[in-house]
Amino acid sequence: IIGADVRNGMIASHGWTNQSKVNAVNLIKGFNPSIINSIIYTDITRDGSLQGVNLEQTINFAKSIPHPVIASGGVSSIEDISNLSKQISNGVEGVVIGRALYDKKFTFADALKSIKLVK
């Protein structure tokens, strides 16, 4: 699994303090595909903010690479989980939930139920 910390389509590093000019999609496409199982795509403009997932940007990233994507950053509601779970055909196969669980916006059981309702 490779983690891609992304701000406006570009890779960020060093605890997100270094904004590169490296396009995230181009970087991932440059790796040998046989060594990659999936990509954790973190939208660092939303991570920990509870602003909601940037669904459009996440889908665009997932559709542009040949690997399953685990979405991260901004999850704030069951609706975010449900919307992401509908994107399996676009390459989004998982989600990282952090602050929303810590802040008790919903329970893990509720998140699982919302995924089962979509499938």
Feature annotation, model-predicted:
Residues 10, 46-51, 77, 103:
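Short, small-residue-enriched loops and turns at beta-alpha junctions
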Residues 1-47:
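Conserved anion-binding
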Residues 56-91, 111:
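Catalytic cores of alpha/beta
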Residues 85-119:
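C-terminal helical cap(s) of enzyme catalytic domains, especially alpha/beta-barrels
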Residues 12-15, 50-53, 81-83, 106-108:
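Short, well-ordered secondary-structure micro-motifs
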Residues 2, 39, 61, 84, ...:
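Conserved, mostly hydrophobic/aromatic
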Residues 14, 71-72, 97:
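Thr-Gly-centered strand-to-loop micro-motif
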